[in-house]
Amino acid sequence: MNGGYGMQFDVLREFACHDNAEVVRLNAYVAYDTARAEADPNYAEGQRNFHSSLRDFGYKVIQKDVKRYTDAEGTAIAKANSDLDMAVDMLLQSEKLDRVLMLTGDGDFVQVVRALQNRGCRVELVAFENVSSELRREVDMFIPGWLIPNLLPIRGAPRGAPAWGEIGSRVRGVCYYHKDVEGYGFMRFLDRVDADLWISDTRRKDSPYKTAYFHDSYLLDHLEPGEIPNRDIIFEFDLHRSLRNDGLEARNIKVVARL
């Protein structure tokens, strides 16, 4: 999965049950390079530990061996393709499911999504970078993995740092409102995961989202005029107590992904 390195699979499992759902099956499709494992004991041990951790969290590990071939231009390519296995498993297992959560950005799954929906399944999508726009339109809900609290740890966060959403913590969100001339805007971030992920209006008390004001001087990356607001640009920022009111303020704002 592009952009998802370091993902916390225990957090992913919790997210899959965000509306008190019961897990029926957790499939993890992993690539394994047999040739590299034979030559590199550290790689082999690391993969075994990773697979064991997945099983500890309740995932069924489906291993796909890396295959090497040379293309028409003479370029050596290593690839482990699990798309077909994933599609077949979803179709076969969907008879006993109310909802399917997919982690992929591959547009080849559009027809699979339609087939699942025609069977009465709700299909939700979590992805990071290089996400097919057609796949995003087809699913019942799409959420960038960057925005799920603690799914992808904040790089460089010190030990003992405030928890996601607390004052002094660093979170990820999107800019949903911005005034170019005045030079300010508002970020929205997911504060908690629950059954009401559709309630994005932070004025509602039951919304799992929160808003943080920001001034353009806190933007660490250059953005062209009119480039924000844009929900396809993921920002990472520090949360501070606002000096203007009792709300939140975003500082040290950095672009971490563009979908």
Q: Where do the language-model regions lie?
A:
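Structural detector for short beta-strands of small beta-barrel domains
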Residues: 166-181
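Short aromatic-glycine-enriched beta-strand elements
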Residues: 180-201
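Short nucleic-acid-contacting surface segments enriched for D/E, G, S/T with interspersed K/R
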Residues: 218-236
